[in-house]
Amino acid sequence: MNRASLEKRPDEVATMFDDVAPKYDVVNDVLSMGQTRRWRRIVVDAMDVKVGQKVLDLAAGTGTSSEPYADAGVDVVACDFSLGMLKVGKRRRPDIDFIAGDATNLPFADNSFDASTISFGLRNVVEPRKALEEMLRVTKPGGRLVIAEFSHPVVPLWRNLYTEYLMRALPAIATKVSSNPDAYVYLAESIRAWPDQDHLAQWLSDAGWTDITYRNLSGGIVAVHRAQKPDEHRESVPVAKLRRQIKPRHQAG
């Protein structure tokens, strides 16, 4: 069995995802009790991209998150550093452009995409702040970024129940449905170690993104952050003004 440590060495993380690739989407549906696909639909709505626009879907894995864009006539590039995931995705959707790439050193020119997105992948990057800077670099001025990531439930009782599920129930279920249950121990540990909604918003501001908002889904189990790359003639909003800039939405979603 292969699992990554919380040091998130790229070779370990890539190997772990290679191992789980064949059943990745099915296991996700089971472990999220069917919520994963709903969360991804909300991300697509938040992206609000048009036919003919070009979108970067980073940490796209098998391309499940890329499919809605391709089906809608959007030029989507599915990028991931797990070759195993990309192979599964290319077999499923040969019409989608799958490209191997490192989130901290993207293989794209500046200002290549009208919008960028990453769902449930930023947490697995060894230098997530560098990834935010790289996505800023490859996104066109005025372009949008949408991030979906596991976060921190906002209701204390719900937070306690969720922690119990992560650390006890999830690994037990993974043993039954996954070929590499140890990978889902890493999943639980990495979620617990991930910063909360406001900290991620601060990282976005530090990276140069503006107009930052977030929305909590399922009581804060997942947060969807949205931001914009400044137009070339605009200056980034000072970090001191971030609290006034962020407009959190705490509904369960």
From Swiss-Prot:
UniProt KW keywords: Menaquinone biosynthesis, Methyltransferase, S-adenosyl-L-methionine, Transferase
Documented EC number(s): 2.1.1.163
Matches recorded under InterPro entries: SAM-dependent_MTases_sf (IPR029063), UbiE/COQ5_MeTrFase (IPR004033), UbiE/COQ5_MeTrFase_CS (IPR023576)
Pathway: Quinol/quinone metabolism; menaquinone biosynthesis; menaquinol from 1,4-dihydroxy-2-naphthoate: step 2/2
One record GO biological process: menaquinone biosynthetic process
GO molecular function: demethylmenaquinone methyltransferase activity
Residues noted as binding S-adenosyl-L-methionine in the record, renumbered to the chain: T62, D80, D102, A103, S119
Catalytic activity: a 2-demethylmenaquinol + S-adenosyl-L-methionine = a menaquinol + S-adenosyl-L-homocysteine + H(+)
Record has S-adenosyl-L-methionine as a keyword: yes
Function according to Swiss-Prot or TrEMBL: Methyltransferase required for the conversion of demethylmenaquinol (DMKH2) to menaquinol (MKH2).
The family this protein is said to belong to: Belongs to the class I-like SAM-binding methyltransferase superfamily. MenG/UbiE family.
Protein name: Demethylmenaquinone methyltransferase
Gene: menG
